[in-house]
Amino acid sequence: GANDAALRALCHKTLAKMHFSAAEEGLGEWLRPPAKPQGGNARSLPKHLQKPAPLAAERGTIVIAGCEAHVCLLQTALDLIDDEFEVWVVTDACGSRTERNRDAAFDRLAGAGAELVTTEMVAFEWLGSCEHPAFKDVLGLIK
């Protein structure tokens, strides 16, 4: 359904959904960067001056977590994988009504190609090095 007005005001962009999968509401298109326009009229240039056709866009990486790992998160992640995204599921930031449901969702997601990660794994991968300007701040949050 609709997002809470107070939360919506804090966000640049929001997605209201009624389907269990947010991809059904256009999440994949929303996350994909816009295509870059081609410059000039290629037919007007000699072949040796024409720009090569753009390579296929790199697979975007989506980091996902949520409350109902076995319902909305599962269906959204599976649809994003089908839509050619690389999906990282932050397992320690996911829940379900029961551990069995959560673990079954993780098993299914791993089998479909999702990367199962933890909050710390994501944080340190994004930092890349202890020389990152935010390293000490992140370390303080984790400890």
Question: Residue ranges of each PLM-predicted region?
Answer:
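Short, solvent-exposed polar/charged micro-motifs at secondary-structure junctions
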Residues: E25-L27, W126-S129
